[in-house]
Amino acid sequence: MLLEDFIKMFEAELADIIPGTLLPETVYKQLDAWNSMQALILIAMVDADYGVTLTAENLHDCVTVSDLFSVVQNKKTLLNS
């Protein structure tokens, strides 16, 4: 699982985001496209593509795209151990 792949999938799910504009340090909650519907879409994407469940608390605690990726990666590691 690579951060770059996660970012590409995240971009694909966000409305009005030009591919290649998100960076690991992007504060995703400050994006114009970010809203509660996008949060639900992200939760569904992570479940479908990575097999882990993000919670509202996870989204609240994370600040950057990289933070989100770290949570997904950690949850995936726990599932596989």
Describe every region a protein language model picked out.
Residues 1-43, 48-81:
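Phosphopantetheine-dependent thiolation modules in NRPS/PKS and related acyl-activating systems
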